[in-house]
């Protein structure tokens, strides 16, 4: 192979930098696991795992994009390389190594076996879009997977529309009658529609029963007026007033409007 040009040298340098980043990320994770007492939190481990995963993806994409160059390049020591130094011999042996480390070779073999079904051609796929791997596992072909993904969103949406999400009963149970539903619970479930209606009625009633019953000037340096608000007495007769808290007379609406426009305190004109 002829000498490398600047672009090829840049590609090799990028490979080196990415591998260094991955090595530092792995070393940081190993150090935190070995030296931390107690062990790092799950969030810290997840963050480190995410960094390592991103580094692996970056290296994988880089190696795939430059596969032709990296597979054809040949490494050899220059005459000026100090190979007589023992420390340099270790690095030289790693660079000139033609076979992978046994452990790495096992990892690569397992990865290729795991990725083989997804890269297999659809030739020989059965009528149902399935084919059988060398290990006997039956998998869907690429066309069958694409067809499945086209069908799944529509089918899931149609099924979701049939459900009463967040309720105590499904639409099928309501059609059959909720009195016939066996929930297995010791408590009695209430109908959601009736509960929603009662909540809305209570909310409207509470909003109508609030009245301004008094006003006084705010104490301290802050200027302004404070209004006393209490529940209105909606009952009639002696029974309605029994047990009710006696409150100050209601401030007329025109008094409140006059205070808002002129600043005159209610009752002091």
From Swiss-Prot:
GO MF annotation terms: RNA polymerase II cis-regulatory region sequence-specific DNA binding; transcription coregulator activity
Localization, UniProt: Nucleus
Disordered: region residues: 187-217
Top-level taxon: Eukaryota
Composition-biased stretches (Acidic residues): 190-211
Function, in words: Component of the Mediator complex, a coactivator involved in the regulated transcription of nearly all RNA polymerase II-dependent genes. Mediator functions as a bridge to convey information from gene-specific regulatory proteins to the basal RNA polymerase II transcription machinery. Mediator is recruited to promoters by direct interactions with regulatory proteins and serves as a scaffold for the assembly of a functional preinitiation complex with RNA polymerase II and the general transcription factors.
Protein name (Swiss-Prot/TrEMBL): Mediator of RNA polymerase II transcription subunit 8
Source species: Aspergillus niger (strain ATCC MYA-4892 / CBS 513.88 / FGSC A1513)
């Amino acid at each position: 192979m002829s000498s490398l040009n600047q672009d090829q040298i840049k590609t090799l340098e990028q490979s080196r930098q990415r591998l260094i980043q991955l090595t530092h990320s792995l070393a940081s994770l190993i150090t935190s696991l070995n030296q931390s007492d107690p062990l790092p939190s799950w969030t810290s481990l997840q963050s480190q795992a995410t960094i390592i995963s991103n580094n692996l993806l970056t290296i994988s994409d880089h190696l795939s994009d430059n596969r032709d160059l990296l597979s054809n390049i040949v490494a050899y020591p220059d005459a000026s390389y100090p190979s007589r130094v023992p420390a340099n011999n270790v690095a030289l042996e790693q660079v000139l190594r033609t076979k992978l480390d046994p452990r790495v070779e096992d990892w690569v073999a397992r990865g290729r076996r795991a990725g083989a079904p997804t890269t297999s051609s659809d030739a020989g796929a059965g009528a149902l879009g399935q084919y059988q791997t060398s290990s006997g596992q039956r998998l869907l072909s690429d066309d069958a997977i694409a067809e499945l993904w086209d069908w799944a969103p529509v089918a899931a949406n149609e099924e979701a529309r049939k459900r009463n999400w967040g309720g105590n009963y499904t639409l099928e149970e309501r059609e059959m009658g909720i009195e016939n539903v066996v929930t297995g619970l010791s408590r009695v479930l209430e109908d959601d529609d009736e509960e929603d209606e009662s909540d809305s009625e209570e909310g409207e009633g509470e909003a109508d029963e609030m009245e301004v019953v008094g006003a006084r000037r705010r104490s301290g340096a802050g200027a302004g007026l404070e209004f006393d608000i209490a529940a209105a007495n909606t009952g009639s007769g002696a029974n309605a007033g029994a047990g009710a808290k006696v409150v100050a007379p209601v401030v007329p609406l025109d008094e409140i409007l006059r205070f808002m426009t002129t600043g005159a305190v209610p009752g002091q004109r």
